[in-house]
Amino acid sequence: MLTSDTRDTDACVKEALELAEAGCEIIRLTAQTKAYAANLENIARELRAAGCHVPLVADIHFKPDAAMEAAKWVEKIRINPGNFVDKKKFEVREYSDAEYREELDRLREEFTPLVLFCREHGRAMRIGSNHGSLSDRILNRFGDTPEGMVESAIEFAQIARDLDYHSLVFSMKASNVKVMVAAYRLLVERMNALGPDWNYPIHLGVTEAGGGEDGRIKSAVGIGSLLTDGIGDTLRVSLTEDAVREVPVAYRLSNPFQPSERSDDPVSFPEPELSYDPLKFSKRQGGLAMCYGVRLGWEQPVRVAVPDAGFYALQTEREAMGDMMPELSLGQLDAIEVDPRCDADLEPLKELAEPSLVTVKNGLAMEPVYAFRLLAARIEDRHLILLKDTLVPGSVSGEDVPLTAARNIGSLLCDGIGDAVLIQGESDPRLASFLGFNILQATGTRLTRADYVSCPSCGRTLYNIQEATARIRKATEHLKGVKIAVMGCIVNGPGEMADADFGYVGGAPNKINLYVKHTPVKFNIPQEEAVERLVDLIKEYGRWVDPK
């Protein structure tokens, strides 16, 4: 998605050409008003004249008239069903069935002109639910849930289908990766139940993932988990960085799932019965074990381990590592290694008197996610599971290491599987430990520092969000468990903050509004003062501790 102001034709064309050169295959621009949408004509014309024919998408919030204007000039319209017609007021009320139908009739009346225009002019449409911006109507009936996200999109899609329009794409984005994964899975189940003619493409993304390694890991957990499940046709990695930096990360995530050039018939394996509900998160409740004074399992945090040599090398850095210090070595864990397909490996586990830590053997020709899902399905619940990022240490390298680890371990954590994690793909024990804790942080499994919801910036952003995010992180990263949202604008920012404790939101050019939960409490603060005022606000609400 472009970060340039949509009214600035030259800047948008330059950025779009850079994205196309980097390999971006679809380019999205914000169109927050009809005037912004009208300039898409100039942008599209200049791009086509420059030989760039990458499809353009207009991103629409709140403004049906902007959508109608944008549809004249671009190949695709993205609407948010949470705010295309409904205005979010955070009101709590009960809707009778009759009142709910009246609201749907109003929605149909507002939405129909856009559907008919797109149908007649060959435009595509993405119906993109966002967890943080569900309408009051949906929230009051379905709650702030994956079910609400899916129903919100299905309502719009049904109207489109009634008008014989089918050029639809769905997305179910959230900053909480467990919610995101559950919502996409629920969407697929719902589409399957509605019938084979509901087989529409699906666009993947973790909204407000942030920047740096945190943003990449969070995106890899959410997007990678779904790609592993066979879900997804397009994807966008939302980083609080220059847009062109998102593209190589997207390719690294998608490359393992691209169709093979080999002509061999695919090999199918019987699916084991799952030991968990893939549509609702629930932690697998194993027994309780003790390893060298460290409790594992029942109601304990997921532990981080590293290979023996690395663990002992880190002992001199214990103070510097702080909360990111691995708690155990692989040898101390004394995990039982098994092939989850082999009855001879699994039968002895039934004879053990006490809960034991079990893991999958290295070297097996199995994808880690499938191997550990099978293990969880085949061993007794009382036994604990040590997750591994790879079963073939050394098989990945460079920037693929954290993305692969996040995809494999993160997917399993989102399924509630895992009592300890071992990073084998990273040879540096310090980096391996950091990676393990960062994956736990990204999945919300275990928080060792502040958590951030940071939007990737777009043409609506009213200040330098990359600089502000870096300053906020530097000032607050030590606040374990505090969640801070850094949002570019007030158009969609307050809703997209989701469950953040505090919000830092652009209110006017270079002016910041500060929020507590969804409530704005400080207004029009000059950007150069805003981080300090945010710290004061955190102190005022009793969430501040001095850094060590």
Where in this protein do the model-derived segments appear?
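Short, acidic/polar
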Residues: 7-18, 62-68, 153, 219-223, ...
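Glycine-rich, proline-tolerant flexible connector loops at the mouths of alpha/beta enzymes
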Residues: 3-8, 22-47, 81-102, 168-177, ...
